[in-house]
């Protein structure tokens, strides 16, 4: 098994999803975030960065 040497990024949901667009709610769930203050450590990839850019006003990125 190869070692995982890729960088990771921590994402925290800091705002609730009430009143947001359904597309943005789906993006937050795709990041694995469900409740306020949920934190996920994700592999830093263009796909993840795109999801973060979509919901930048709902999440906080902790490198």
Swiss-Prot record:
Keyword Ribosomal protein assigned to the entry: answer is yes
What keywords would UniProt list here? Answer: Ribonucleoprotein, Ribosomal protein
For whether the record's keyword set contains Thylakoid, the answer is: no
Gene3D superfamilies associated with the record: Ribosomal protein L30, ferredoxin-like fold domain
Provide a GO CC annotation, any one: cytosolic large ribosomal subunit
One GO biological process from the UniProt record? translation
GO MF terms on file? structural constituent of ribosome
- CDD domains linked to this entry: Ribosomal_L30_like (cd00355)
Q: Which InterPro entries match?
A: Ribo_uL30_ferredoxin-like_sf (IPR036919), Ribosomal_uL30_bac-type (IPR005996), Ribosomal_uL30_ferredoxin-like (IPR016082)
Instruction: Extract the SUPFAM superfamilies matched here.
Output: Ribosomal protein L30p/L7e (SSF55129)
Domain of life of the organism in this record?
A: Bacteria
Belongs to which family?
A: Belongs to the universal ribosomal protein uL30 family.
| Quaternary context | Part of the 50S ribosomal subunit.
The entry's protein name is Large ribosomal subunit protein uL30
């Amino acid at each position: 098994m190869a070692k995982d040497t890729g960088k990771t990024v921590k994402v925290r949901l800091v705002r609730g999803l009430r009143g947001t667009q359904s597309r943005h709610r789906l993006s937050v769930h795709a990041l694995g975030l469900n409740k306020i203050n949920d934190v996920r450590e994700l592999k830093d990839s263009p796909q993840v960065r795109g999801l973060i850019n979509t919901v930048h006003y709902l999440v906080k990125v902790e490198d």
